[in-house]
Amino acid sequence: MHSILRFEDKLDFEITDVYDTKYSLRVGKNTNKEVKSDSSGHIIKNIEKIDWDSFDTLILGHIDMLILQMKSYDFKNNLISEALRHNKQIYSFDDLGQIVKNNKRVQSPTILPEHLPPFRYEKLHENIVPVVGVFGTGGRQGKFTLQVTLRNCLRNKGFKVGQIGTEPSALLFGMEYVFPIGYNSVYSLRIHDYDVIRYLNETIHKLEDTRCDIILVGSQSASVNIYPNHLYYYNIFQTNFLMGTRPDAIILSISMNDTYEYIEKTISFLESTVECEVIALCLFPVVQTFDWAGPVDPSNITVSYTHLRA
C-alpha cells in the first residue's frame, strides 16, 4: 500500500482519502511522513467515519494482522458489505472469493487453474523481446519501488514497456499482469510447480504480442535459501518465477548486511538457473540509521563498493 502513496503522482486515478483504524495509531498523521515521500499529503482518517460519497472505488490492503489487533473478526466482512451497499467498486490485495462470489465490482489479484494456457505437450515459447528482472537477496529492499522507477524512466525515454508485477498494487500502476507471490500468496496463487512456469511463459508471450520494446519483471524477497532447516525460507515461488520469466538481464537488490559471499552465491544461482547476466547491484537502504549500540550518525557512515568479479 505504501507504494501507491509514494508514487501517487504516477497513478491514473485520484486518491481522495486514506483511512485506517484507530488501533494502528496512525489516524491523524500525514501520509508523506508515513511513506517518506513528498508526493503524498493526506491526513489519515478513521475508517469508522468513512465518507462513502467521496469516492467510487475502495482499495483494500492486507488487513489480516490489523483484524487480529482489533479482535473484530467481522470487520472485513462488514466493510465489504457496507461498500457494496453503497455501490462501490472494491480492489482487494487479498482474495475475497470466500466472502464475495461472482461480483464484478469486486476484484483481487488471484491466479487460478482455469487461467492456465492450453496444454501443449510441455512445449514453451521462446522469449523474443528483452526481459529485465529485479531480484533480491532478502526482503524490504525496495524492489517494487525500483520496478516502478525503471518503468517510469523507460516510458519517459519513449520505450513501450510490458510488465509483470508481483505486488497486488501492480495493476493499479498500469502494469499488464500481476503474479502475487508476496504476502498471503497461499490464498492468491492457486497454481504450483510446472504450472507456474507454463503460466508465466504464456504471459511473457502475450506481452510480446503487444509489440512492447522491453519487458520488466520483479520477484519477491530472497532468491536462494540460507536457512535449510526451515521450510519458510525455501524460495520455491521465486525460483519458479525466475524459470518462468527467464530474464536476459537481472538487477540484484542487496542489503548493507549482506556478505560478499552471499551476494556471489545469489549471482551464481541466478545466472546458472537461467541464461542471464546480473548487470547491476542496487543497495537499499544506503544509510542504516540504527545498529546494536543505538542510533548512528549518518555523517560517520561510509559506503564502499568492491567489484565482486575483480
PLM regions: where:
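Long, basic/Gly/Ser/Thr-rich N-terminal segments
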Residues: 1-98, 300
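ATP-dependent carboxylate-amine ligase catalytic core
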Residues: 26-54, 153-238, 244, 258-264, ...
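Flexible, glycine/proline-enriched loop segments at strand-loop-helix junctions
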Residues: 68-70, 134-141, 187-191
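Extreme N-terminal, non-catalytic leader segments
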Residues: 76-131
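Walker A (P-loop) phosphate-binding motif
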Residues: 119-157
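G-domain G4 guanine-recognition motif of GTPases
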Residues: 137, 253-256, 281-294
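Conserved C-terminal guanine-recognition region of P-loop GTPase G domains, centered on the G4
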Residues: 262-273
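Conserved small/polar residues in nucleotide/adenosyl-binding loops
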Residues: 306-310
